[in-house]
Amino acid sequence: MTSTIAIDQKLINFLMFLGLPKSLSEFIWICIPILVVVLGSTLGVLVIVWLERKISAAVQQRIGPEYAGPLGIIQALIDGLKLILKEDIIPSKGDNWLFTLGPAIVVIPIVLSYLVVPFGPNLIVADIGIGIFFWIAISSVAPMGLLIAGYGSNNKYSLLGGLRAAAQAISYEIPLALCVLAIILMSHSLSTIEIVEQQAKYGILGWNIWRQPIGFFVFLISSLAECERLPFDLPEAEEELVAGYQTEYCGIKFGLFYVASYINLLVSALFVSVLYLGGWDFSIPFLNDYLTSTDFFSQWELNETIVGIMTGIIGLGITLVKAYIFLFLAVLTRWTLPRIRMDQLLDLGWKFLLPVCLGNLLLTASFQITLL
């Protein structure tokens, strides 16, 4: 699906037409993507929390939230406001700097991951050409924040939770990266946009889920482990560690950990959509060609900008639908599988997933060599 949005220069020209200097107009344009990323990720968290509560209630044959707005849709917003208004307490014997720095180190890299998520050919904040490498690199920074938060709390449960989080992240970051490397070999590109375009050539049959089934399942498991979702929530196991690295946190700092967890889950779901499910592409060849042709929009006599916006909205909707399918599976997994032990977690990562990923990468590389 192609888009012709050139909104950056048009917005700058419009602001200059209003009398603003060019430097100020360019600065405003720089701030707009930042605002879009922050608001978009926050809205995504609110939707995920509401969906998880409703799906969890359905699994347990409950009603779920229903009083805060229609169907309880603003319950997550009210909970967020409650955390913001709570007092921020710092442990008397903890390290104030590390205790405060930990949540920031966790949240910032995860939010920056949105920069390279393509919702359409031109609906991406930063098409840097090495987007998938950027995501892998920056996502490895967040576990450092968890370890710092656990150490700065001066609490044995927090420290153990931070150590568990670091060990878990290292164990599953490698299989995740190897799955992505196999996709890169098949797509011949590090650009997230080019990976989607490569899958769009053959419609739904061109999705990488059919060409990389082993990598897809390993990617799903590794993503759940990276997001610390059940059955991989060992760093914050209530029965063992009270709340893990979050034990001493309250108020807005605790809310940052909460938000980071769901933002990370949404980012993982979006990359599942981009890497394996065709991203924004409609995936039905004849219908996709018709929707993206000029004949489809010419019947309403729309100008080029409106056409670009409409195709961009369609691509955004398709990407989110595919991503929320993964989110639905993640919520069902939470209420289906029991928590595993720490030794089982590490054995699964190092003794099973890593050899499987290496074998899958070897097969992919061998197949690509035969095509040369």
Curated annotation (Swiss-Prot):
GO biological process: aerobic respiration; photosynthesis, light reaction
Alphabetical keyword list: Chloroplast, Membrane, NAD, NADP, Plastid, Plastoquinone, Quinone, Thylakoid, Translocase, Transmembrane, Transmembrane helix
Transmembrane segments: 28-48, 65-85, 97-117, 128-148, 166-186, 254-274, 312-332, 352-372
Annotated catalysed reactions: a plastoquinone + NADH + (n+1) H(+)(in) = a plastoquinol + NAD(+) + n H(+)(out); a plastoquinone + NADPH + (n+1) H(+)(in) = a plastoquinol + NADP(+) + n H(+)(out)
UniProt KW Transmembrane helix keyword: yes
Cystine bridges: none
Pfam families in alphabetical order: NADHdh
Highest taxon of source: Eukaryota
GO CC terms in record: chloroplast thylakoid membrane
Subcellular location: Plastid, Chloroplast thylakoid membrane
Enzyme class: translocase
InterPro entries: NADH_UbQ_OxRdtase_su1/FPO, NADH_UbQ_OxRdtase_su1_CS
EC number per UniProt: 7.1.1.-
KW Cell cycle (keyword) present: no
Membrane topology, from the record: Multi-pass membrane protein
Gene Ontology MF annotations: NADH dehydrogenase activity; oxidoreductase activity, acting on NAD(P)H, quinone or similar compound as acceptor; quinone binding
Stated role: NDH shuttles electrons from NAD(P)H:plastoquinone, via FMN and iron-sulfur (Fe-S) centers, to quinones in the photosynthetic chain and possibly in a chloroplast respiratory chain. The immediate electron acceptor for the enzyme in this species is believed to be plastoquinone. Couples the redox reaction to proton translocation, and thus conserves the redox energy in a proton gradient.
Subunit structure: NDH is composed of at least 16 different subunits, 5 of which are encoded in the nucleus.
Protein family according to the UniProt entry: Belongs to the complex I subunit 1 family.
Official protein name in the record: NAD(P)H-quinone oxidoreductase subunit 1, chloroplastic
